[in-house]
Amino acid sequence: MGTQHRIKVDVPDRVLYTVGSCVLVIGSIGITGNLLVLYAFYSNKRLRTPANYFIMNLAASDFLMSATQAPICFLNSMHTEWILGDIGCNFYVFCGALFGITSMMTLLAISVDRYCVITKPLQSIKRSSKKRSCIIIAFVWLYSLGWSVCPLFGWSSYIPEGLMISCTWDYVSYSPANRSYTMMLCCFVFFIPLIIIFHCYLFMFLAIRSTGRNVQKLGSTYNRKSNVSQSVKSEWKLAKIAFVAIVVFVLSWSPYACVTLIAWAGYAKTLNPYSKSVPAVIAKASAIYNPIIYAIIHPRYRRTIRSAVPCLRFLIRISPSDLSTSSVNESSFRASMSSRHSFAARNKSSCVSSISAAETTWSDMELEPVEAARKKQQPHRSRSFSKQAEEETGLLLKTQSCNVLTGEKVAVSSISLHDPFERSFGENAPELLLRPSCLRTSSLPFGLNSSSTEENADTSDMEVQEQHQMEASSH
């Protein structure tokens, strides 16, 4: 770090005091707000979902950003120059770069997660887990760490900037190392993630619009219309919250990115101390926006904070609708996937509907002994068809033999039941439902067990013997 960077800037001291005071206020709000976000998501178990782990990570990085940047900047502004030397400058910029890049990459992870949940719900159900979220978060931190330590090992360097009360990487010097680092950092930390984020939200919007149209078309056929609509609204509501946070973050860092690109293009002399320091302050103020966004939009977060911090009740208000009903964005991103699953596989849903209809037909066509016993054993029709089939298969295993007359009745019953099932399900029906053994099981009288069969067999043998005796006596 050269001595030319330690020259005191020729600006009034009151300007430095004002900037330092603003930074301190911003940092205090960021520390308090993000601590409240972390407390809300930690204390409320319903908020601790795999998707919300990314929000907690974002709050953690914003908290650390405010805690490390604001006090140091305020201290130097009170002395009207940088007083912490090279080590303090390296620490200041390293922390700012690490936590700032982590916030950007976390927003990217949130966007990709929302994209997968809304456009590929079936795959997201299988992949969703807290362990997976933690692995992604660990990768985000390692990625940010890699970019932050590069200037410490010679690829660019950390120097004081602007009003000389803060530090940044050297984007002013026109050296190959500084220019390459500045361009790579802007591309892989800002512009490329930004393109991916807007790509995700574009396709999310198209998927939501397409799903809404399909729900309207299928509303007369499916009684799950309200569930699917609620699921779609829930997913889109949560995606909009993340989108607002992303837009605010991008707007905060865009001026700083523009300043670095101007210097990278060779026009560093056109930048004055104010044009260098003010964008940096705006960028680091992005740490305070997320708590405000969640306090305004997220009802469960508001309720948690109100109950934990009574003194904030006059600032955080809850509408009657939030108190009476659960908001659409309270549920987990994955909790509503069951209705999304049924809608995404609507061809299979029609088969499930056919199962329900066929189940009613089956109960109407059963023999009276079976129907009477079934009413005792199955008080509710809400049990799954597969469970009923298992019970009926167990009944079939108890049956070992039957007489000719009963066998004919069973055969007739199975034939009469096979036709409506085949018409209802078609070729795509589950194999279990078309299995003749399952159909015959439902038609077997409960008295047709092994003991009754043996009694019938003994009675038949006695009748045959008596008939032979009568024939012998007549002869």
Swiss-Prot record:
Cellular localization per UniProt = Cell membrane
Would you kindly state one Gene Ontology biological process term found in this protein's UniProt entry? phototransduction
Keywords for the protein's UniProt record, in alphabetical order: Cell membrane, Chromophore, Disulfide bond, G-protein coupled receptor, Glycoprotein, Membrane, Photoreceptor protein, Receptor, Retinal protein, Sensory transduction, Transducer, Transmembrane, Transmembrane helix
Q: What positions does the record give for glycosylation?
A: 178
Q: Which residues lie on this side of the membrane: Extracellular?
A: 1-21, 75-90, 156-187, 262-276
Domain of life assignment: Eukaryota
Q: Where is the composition biased (Acidic residues)?
A: 455-464
| Residues in the Cytoplasmic compartment per record | 43-53, 112-134, 209-240, 298-475
Q: Where are the transmembrane segments?
A: 22-42, 54-74, 91-111, 135-155, 188-208, 241-261, 277-297
Q: List the disulfide bonds.
A: 89-167
Give the Basic residues compositional bias ranges. Answer: 375-384
Residue ranges of region Disordered?
Answer: 370-390, 445-475
Q: Does the entry feature the keyword Acetylation, yes or no?
A: no
Residues bearing N6-(retinylidene)lysine? Answer: 284
> Locations of Basic and acidic residues compositional bias?
465-475
> InterPro entries per the record?
GPCR_opsins, GPCR_Rhodpsn, GPCR_Rhodpsn_7TM, Opsin, Retinal_BS
Q: Does the keyword Secreted apply?
A: no
* Chain intervals with Polar residues compositional bias: 445-454
GO MF annotations, alphabetized:
G protein-coupled receptor activity; photoreceptor activity
Which cellular component, as a GO term, is one annotated location?
plasma membrane
Q: What is the recorded membrane topology of this protein?
A: Multi-pass membrane protein
Record Gene3D superfamilies: Rhodopsin 7-helix transmembrane proteins
PANTHER family given in the database record? OPSIN
Q: What does this protein do?
A: Photoreceptor implicated in non-image-forming responses to light. May be able to isomerize covalently bound all-trans retinal back to 11-cis retinal.
Which family does the record assign? Belongs to the G-protein coupled receptor 1 family. Opsin subfamily.
Q: What is this protein called?
A: Melanopsin
